[in-house]
Amino acid sequence: MSGYSRRKFLTRASCGAMSVVVGARSLQAAVSGNDLDEFIEAEMQGQRIPGLAACIVKSGKIVWSKGYGWSRVKRHVAMDPDRTIQNIGSISKTVTATAVMQLWEKGKFELDDDINNYLPFSVRNPSHPDKPISFRCLLTHRSSIADSPAYMSSYACGDPRVSLETWIKDYFIPDGRYYRREVNFHPWSPGKKHRYSNVGFGLLGYLVEKLSGESFTKFTKRTILDPLGMKTTGWMLSEIASESHAVPYVPVNDGQVNKVLQAYKKVGILGGEVERDPVRGSYQPVCLYSFPNYPDGLVRTGVNQLARFLLAYVNHGVYGGARILEADTVQLMLTRQNATTPHQGLCWATLPHEGQPHWFHDGSDPGIRTSMSFRPSDGVGAIVFINRTDVDLKKFNERLYRESARF
């Protein structure tokens, strides 16, 4: 499946026997066939991937999960679908969208309402001041809100240094620190065109705070993460066990990522001693970073933890006896919202694969690449986490769906 990525970071303003060491395995891995292992290991060597964890879900449960390679190359810490945590990029948007739709279910707003009715300040595209931006516009990337250079430069090591509220106000209020009308907004009116917007999802996170009266992190923990039993998942480094966090990497001596290396150095998140793997090459570590617009991409979790969230969508809003959304709400989110953008639902996107629709979201950020998807027709889904930048996930996803027939 082709990706629906967060972005190419800082490059676009908007998505035979091998001696590869296999990392820790989950209980389900005992049923793994050698062919799948060999395929994954060969792809990891070919794409210079330090570590990978993945799972297949089917019949309402995880039927296979396994880790390969290293979450921390120098220390030889194995990638593990149970224990390894990493930031998952734009897959996080599905958690944010879930929180938004929980509030919609409670009657807090209507999807086509003007968001200004729920904000303490006005958000308008200055080129179209009379055209409101709706919740639906934000959830379908039709808000006309752009990701400016200020957004691209907001990454820093550690947890965010400013609050979500401060960031959002500085971005949208005309006298704010980051307000630049010519780069914070596209020239077209809200609703007219589809253009991926990370800042738009930060704004949705802020709206969750205003509508719920709670911080975004507390609301999502109370209504999504805790009910699903995602006990080791969080948004902030302070909320998770940092020793379990995979190190994000970029490969060195690779002409395709030289510009990426320079971009990461510019914002101060790349550094440290080069770490070497005898099979897959050398890597430059990226620090454990964050950004103030975090509702658009900063969930930190493990593969098997995230599978609980995915299975809730597969099972029409419920997992393990905990309902996070009504079935009709899930169906609405997995419905095409605009004829001119037939792949786009509410946050989730769809593409056909072997003649059947798959709903998915990918993630891409410095040192990570991720994907989460499922096929509603039979409830089969897959998750892939990788701790390096700019990896093609299509082959991995296609192979996992093919392997699902064995279970």
Model-derived features: where do they sit?
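N-terminal secretory signal peptides and thylakoid transit peptides that target proteins
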Residues: 1-17
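Short active-site loop at a secondary-structure junction
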Residues: 46-53, 75-138, 185-200, 294-297, ...
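Sec/Tat signal peptide C-region and signal peptidase I cleavage site
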Residues: 25-28
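Short, conserved catalytic-motif segment at the N-terminal edge
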Residues: 31-86, 110, 177-187, 356
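Short, gly/Ser/Thr-rich active-site loops of penicillin-recognizing serine hydrolases
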Residues: 354-357, 384-407
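A short acidic/small-residue loop/turn micro-motif
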Residues: 70-73, 366, 389-391
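Short, well-ordered beta-strand elements
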Residues: 361-362, 369-388
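Short, surface-exposed loop or secondary-structure junction motifs
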Residues: 72, 127-359, 364
